[in-house]
Amino acid sequence: MKSVQFCFLFCCWRAICCRSCELTNITITVEKEECGFCISINTTWCAGYCYTRDLVYRDPARPNIQKTCTFKELVYETVKVPGCAHHADSLYTYPVATECHCSKCDSDSTDCTVRGLGPSYCSFREIKE
């Protein structure tokens, strides 16, 4: 009986404490090579946990797909990068997530690597706005 109560309490704790896949505010650094500057902007992206499991053995009937928290819907916004030369295109377009879900990572539109450059990577000096 105690093990049943423990399992019930553990499941309740997990449901309350562990955040599911949801929209979250993040700051990313954007840069344009022609401009030589970086700026930090606030945007919305997906973060959280998705239920997944690894099979101990390979089963051809059931492929092993790791689910990740990723966007379901997104829109694009544009910002002007200051300090660009007059002949350079100073507009930078970036994605903003509007809806999230747990799904297989789509490497055509998402960086699915374990360790990418990160949202604050900048090759140039940063302009504080």
Curated annotation (Swiss-Prot):
It comes from the Eukaryota. One of its GO terms (cellular component) is follicle-stimulating hormone complex. InterPro entries: Cystine-knot_cytokine (IPR029034), Glyco_hormone_CN (IPR006208), Gonadotropin_bsu (IPR001545), Gonadotropin_bsu_CS (IPR018245). Disulfide bonds join 21-69, 35-84, 38-122, 46-100, 50-102, 105-112. Gene3D superfamilies: Cystine-knot cytokines (2.10.90.10). Pfam families: Cys_knot. Residues 1-20 form the signal peptide. Keywords: Disulfide bond, Glycoprotein, Hormone, Secreted, Signal. Glycans are attached at residues 25, 42. The keyword Transferase does not apply. GO terms for biological process: follicle-stimulating hormone signaling pathway; G protein-coupled receptor signaling pathway; positive regulation of bone resorption; positive regulation of gene expression; positive regulation of steroid biosynthetic process; regulation of osteoclast differentiation; regulation of signaling receptor activity; Sertoli cell proliferation. GO terms for molecular function: follicle-stimulating hormone activity. It is found in: Secreted. PROSITE patterns: GLYCO_HORMONE_BETA_1, GLYCO_HORMONE_BETA_2. Together with the alpha chain CGA constitutes follitropin, the follicle-stimulating hormone, and provides its biological specificity to the hormone heterodimer. Binds FSHR, a G protein-coupled receptor, on target cells to activate downstream signaling pathways. Follitropin is involved in follicle development and spermatogenesis in reproductive organs. Heterodimer. The active follitropin is a heterodimer composed of an alpha chain/CGA shared with other hormones and a unique beta chain/FSHB shown here. Belongs to the glycoprotein hormones subunit beta family. This is Follitropin subunit beta. It comes from Bos taurus. The lineage of its organism: Eukaryota, Metazoa, Chordata, Craniata, Vertebrata.
